[in-house]
Amino acid sequence: MASSFLPSGATTGDSGGELSSGDDSGDVESLQSPKIEASRSLPELFEKAAEHLQGLVQVASREQLLYLYARYKQVKVGNCNTPKPSFFDFEGKQKWEAWKALGDSSPSQAMQEYIAVVKKLDPSWNPQSPEKKGKEANTGFGGPVVSSLYHEEIIREEDKDIFDYCRENNIDHITKVIKTKNMDVNMKDEEGRTLLHWACDRGHKELVTVLLQYRADINCQDNEGQTALHYAAACEFLDIVELLLQSGADPTLRDQDGCLPEEVTGCKAVTLMLQQHTTGKA
């Protein structure tokens, strides 16, 4: 469910360790921005580098792809301006953290660092040589890769299931399905997550309210023993935590690691609310 670095079927090779979320690119240790000749246009070189990278993905580590992704976003979008991905979207969070770590880095710096990594991957690369097209292109992935790394997976309407509509916060569709098809509001996905888990994870408060109105099991636990309250707490949605508590959520339920909802959050306000609620019920 996490958005991938690459199109379906692509691989990135051995990452050689944990992915880095900042300027430390793993295989790109202490890399300095290259000197760009005055006669060359930096944006033009950047676009050529992005195009050339299509044929280098198989030799790039995951750390390098993450490093490149962050700088591509910094150039094309600017400073990180999107919410942190959901609790269990591991790849999405790594990508977001890498981009976020660039802070106010200038597009110029990001372009130079991007070009430097492409040169590191292929020291023989000559920006003046035209890239191979069509069947000659050594992409191995059926099309451009890094130039569109940041695009989220698009699911065709006919391929969507009820959980996809939940992630999209499509309240009308979910309500219609529950009403007309007598769907079990507590049905689970392969990880044991219900619609309520998903709605809490994504911060869809109105949808949470609707699901509770249709008698969603507020204390249902997923395959790891986590309740919707664990998800809302971990994602630091204070308003949803409050709503769940007011609706009867049990803050004393532990997951398989023995953690209470108050122990999976980094938000002091959420922790305090959960502790106060537990104390008040004692």
UniProtKB/Swiss-Prot annotation:
Residues noted as binding an acyl-CoA in the record, renumbered to the chain: 69-73, 95, 114
Localization terms from the record: Cytoplasm
Domain ACB: 42-127
Coiled-coil residue spans: none
InterPro entries: Acyl-CoA-binding_protein, Acyl-CoA-binding_sf, Ankyrin_rpt, Ankyrin_rpt-contain_sf, FERM/acyl-CoA-bd_prot_sf
Region (Disordered): 1-34
Modified residues (Phosphoserine): 41, 106
Coarse class of the protein's main subcellular location: cytoplasm
UniProt keyword list: ANK repeat, Cytoplasm, Lipid-binding, Phosphoprotein, Repeat
ANK repeat extents: 191-220, 224-253
Molecular functions per Gene Ontology: fatty-acyl-CoA binding
GO cellular component entries: cytoplasm
Composition bias type Polar residues, residue spans: 1-12
Low complexity bias locations: 17-31
Record's subunit section: Monomer.
Chain's role: Binds long-chain acyl-coenzyme A molecules with a strong preference for unsaturated C18:1-CoA, lower affinity for unsaturated C20:4-CoA, and very weak affinity for saturated C16:0-CoA. Does not bind fatty acids.
Record's protein name: Acyl-CoA-binding domain-containing protein 6
Source organism of this protein record: Bos taurus (Bovine)
